[in-house]
C-alpha cells in the first residue's frame, strides 16, 4: 500500500513538473515572438520615415502617439506625419544598428537602438548617432507604435 501511494505521489509530481516546464517555455516563446515582431516594426517605422510613406506611418502610429525629439520638442501623431511630409525636409539618411528589445510582454515592447541620422527634419539638423527608444503596444489585437524618444550620443 505504501509503495502504491509513493508511486502515485511520484507520478503526480512528474506530471506537475512537466506542466510547469511547458508553461514556462510557452511564455519564453511568446516573449521571443513579441521581440521579433517589435524588431520588424522598428524597421517598418524607419523605412516609412526614410521613404516619406505617411500612409504606413498613419497605420503604424497609435492615435495617442508621442515622440520626444532632441532639444525636448514633443510631437504627436499628426505633427510627426506632417514633419515627414514637409517638402523642406532634406533627404534623411537613417541607419539603425544595435536594435535591442529591452522589455517584452504580451501587450508592450520597448526597444532601443543606435540610429545614425543625417539630414534636416522637423527643424532639427541631424548629423550623427542617436540613441532611440521606441515603445510598441498591442491595441485591439494589433501592434502599434505608441512613442519614441531620440537623444544624441555625445562624441567620445
Can you say where each PLM-predicted feature lies in the sequence?
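A beta-strand edge to alpha-helix "cap/lid" segment located at domain peripheries
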Residues: 22-156
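Bacterial N-terminal signal peptides
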Residues: 8-18
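Intrinsic disorder/low-complexity segments
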Residues: 1, 14, 22-23
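Bacterial N-terminal signal peptides that target proteins for export
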Residues: 1-9
Amino acid at each position: 500500500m505504501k509503495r502504491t501511494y509513493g508511486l502515485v505521489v511520484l507520478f503526480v509530481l512528474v506530471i506537475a513538473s512537466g506542466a510547469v516546464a511547458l508553461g514556462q517555455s510557452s511564455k519564453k516563446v511568446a516573449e521571443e515572438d513579441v521581440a521579433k515582431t517589435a524588431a520588424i516594426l522598428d524597421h517598418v517605422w524607419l523605412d516609412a520615415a526614410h521613404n516619406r510613406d505617411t500612409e504606413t506611418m498613419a497605420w503604424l502610429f497609435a492615435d495617442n502617439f508621442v515622440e520626444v525629439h532632441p532639444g525636448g520638442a514633443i510631437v504627436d501623431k499628426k505633427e510627426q506625419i506632417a514633419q515627414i511630409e514637409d517638402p523642406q525636409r532634406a533627404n534623411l539618411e537613417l541607419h539603425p544598428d544595435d536594435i535591442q528589445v529591452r522589455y517584452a510582454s504580451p501587450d508592450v515592447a520597448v526597444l532601443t537602438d543606435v540610429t545614425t541620422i543625417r539630414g534636416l527634419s522637423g527643424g532639427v539638423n541631424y548629423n550623427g548617432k542617436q540613441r532611440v527608444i521606441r515603445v510598441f503596444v498591442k491595441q485591439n489585437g494589433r501592434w502599434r507604435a505608441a512613442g519614441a524618444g531620440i537623444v544624441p550620443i555625445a562624441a567620445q
